[in-house]
Structure formats: C-alpha cells, structure tokens
Amino acid sequence: MRYTYEITPRAIQKVRSFYRNVSKKYRHTYSYEDLYRNINKAVDDMYLIEQALVRRKPTIGRWRDYHMAHFGQWYYAYTIEGDTITIQDACHEQNMHN
C-alpha cells in the first residue's frame, strides 16, 4: 500500500530548532552545510516511517494518542487515517522525556 504523507509545521519546527540550537552552541565546528544536511536527512527519514518501521506504542506520555517510530537519531509521533500518514511531532533522542 502506498501512503501519502502530511508533515505538520510542529514536526518540522522541532527538527529545525534542534539543529539551529546545535549550530549556535558549536558555531566554530558546525557549518551551515552540516545544518542543512542534518535537517534534510531528518525530514527525509520521515518519509520512511511505514516502509521500514513497525508501529510502536509511544514511550512518552505526551504522545499517547499516536504511533511512534524511531529512525536514526529522531523519534516521530504519527497517525494513520486511511492511506494518509500525518507526522504530528518529532523529538531528538537526546530530548526524549515526558
């Protein structure tokens, strides 16, 4: 089955803000190329959710109404309605907490 994907602005913003903060903290060693490469990789990984990963129950309370997927260094909260996957939220593994 082929799914269509919708990514909420919240999920994209979480990825961008994480890497923006990394670039501010490590400004002498973290380049703009690294910033854009890491953001693009995290967003590209969102499109692999149902192709490579199994649906899991979330391990954090704020995602209790969603499925959870882990790919690379990111966890994604998503819902499936019909043939549409909606990615609701994203969280880097360093920030996983309730």
PLM feature segments, named:
Residues 1-65:
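Basic, Lys/Arg-enriched alpha-helical interface segments
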Residues 67-98:
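Enriched for short, Lys/Arg-rich terminal
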